[in-house]
Amino acid sequence: MIDPGLDGKAVLVVGGTGGIGNGIAHAFLAQGARVHVTGTRDAADDYHDLPASDLDGLEYHRLDVRDNAAVSRLYIGEAPLDVLVNCMGIVRYGRAEYDPEVFAAAVDVNLIGAMRCSMRFHEDLTMTKGSIINVGSASCFIATPGQPAYSASKGGLLTLTKSLADAWGRDGVRVNGIAPGFVDTRLTQRTIGNAEAYDHSLRSIPLRRWGTPAEMGGVVVFLASSQASYLTGQMVIADGGLTLR
């Protein structure tokens, strides 16, 4: 097996308390990294009621990515950060995102939050010649009429990834992303619980199944690894073929 070179590295997964973010956090933990995660609840114990939140072995920090001061104050230890994963994300259903205030709130978390965190750790990542991985969505590439704010914010994350990769390449910082398709998480339970919608989603995926948080974690670990050392500015689509059609 090729060593990804992540043993002992300092990793921060913003939004790593559940779903895709939690899968990513544990993928790094399995490689020997020191993994920090953020969430919005006061303490790690407050996530015990969520079955998909496994915080064992992870260092928890409360963070509201909408708060500039809170992001600036975030401290994960003396060692500089090696890998930043921006996995924050909110979505609203029932056409709620057509409300301009709801739209703005989603953009503030999903897109501006990623920029805030990237700026906060730019100096660290310059020191370590580290990398940023932004968790986008297949919605970066296809229409999502029910969630215009989610798709717009994740689409913005695609171009932010390219812009930061270009701007910070001279600092030795790589910036990439992944664009997951349908993944079984707390955010997608509404679709899973609707038999018609779920069956339709399966028919739209060439692999005929949804992805898992662990599979997304594998892609992110690769992007952060030494095997991807000449890769930057890319958004890797991990969607089972959803966007091929």
Where are these regions (language model features)?
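Active-site helix of classical SDR
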Residues: S118, S153, T161
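Residue(s) in the substrate-gating loop at a strand-loop-helix junction
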Residues: S137
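Alpha-helical segment proximal to the catalytic Tyr-Lys
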Residues: E123, D166-R170, S229
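Short C-terminal tail/terminal secondary-structure segment
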Residues: M1-I2, I142, V220-V221, T232-R245
